[in-house]
C-alpha cells in the first residue's frame, strides 16, 4: 500500500503485478442488471515477472519494483529506465531505493567484511536529473524541472545549490 493509502499493489503466484486505486469510482452491475457506484478500481496497468515491490514512504505516486534482474522506479505507473540489480528491496525514501544483496550474503557469509557493503542504493531518475541540471544548466532551468517533478529532496538540492552560488 502506498504512503497515503490510496493505492495498493499485489503480486500473484505467477509474478503478475496488479494495482488497485481506492480513490477511483466506477460502476458495477448487480444481480438484477442495474448498476451501482463502487469505490475502488482494479487498474489496467500490469507488469509481468515481478518478484518484489516497495512503495515510496514519502511520495504516494512512486514505487520501485524488481522485474527479473532489473529495478524499475514507477512514477504514476510510468517506468523510468531500468537499472540492473540483484538486490532485495528494503527501503524507498527521498528518491533513493535501498536493496540488500541477500544472494551474496547467503553464498559466502564468511567473506563479508561489513554488512554495509551488501546494501546498494539507487537514485530515482528525477534525483539524478536534478543533480545533472544543477551542474550543467542554469539554476532557473533546474527550478523549472523541480516544479514539474516536485519532491522535498529535490527542493533541498535547489536550496543547497542556491546557497552555494549565493543566488537566493
Show which residues each predicted segment covers.
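Extended alpha-helical assembly domains of large eukaryotic scaffold proteins
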Residues: 1-168
Amino acid at each position: 500500500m502506498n504512503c497515503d493509502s490510496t493505492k495498493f499493489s499485489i503480486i500473484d503466484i505467477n509474478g503478475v503485478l496488479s494495482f488497485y486505486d481506492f480513490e477511483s469510482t466506477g460502476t458495477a452491475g448487480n444481480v438484477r442488471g442495474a448498476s451501482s457506484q463502487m469505490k475502488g478500481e482494479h487498474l489496467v496497468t500490469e507488469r509481468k515477472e515481478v518478484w518484489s515491490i516497495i512503495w515510496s514512504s514519502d511520495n504516494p505516486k512512486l514505487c520501485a519494483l524488481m522485474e527479473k534482474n532489473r529495478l524499475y522506479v514507477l512514477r504514476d505507473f510510468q517506468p523510468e529506465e531500468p537499472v540492473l540489480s540483484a538486490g532485495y528491496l528494503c527501503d524507498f525514501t527521498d528518491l533513493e531505493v535501498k536493496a540488500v544483496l541477500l544472494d551474496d550474503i547467503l553464498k559466502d557469509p564468511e567473506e563479508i567484511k561489513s554488512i554495509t557493503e551488501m546494501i546498494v542504493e539507487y537514485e530515482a531518475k528525477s534525483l539524478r536529473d536534478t543533480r545533472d541540471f544543477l551542474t550543467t544548466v542554469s539554476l532557473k532551468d533546474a527550478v523549472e524541472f523541480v516544479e514539474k517533478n516536485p519532491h522535498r529532496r529535490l527542493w533541498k538540492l535547489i536550496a543547497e545549490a542556491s546557497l552555494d552560488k549565493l543566488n537566493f
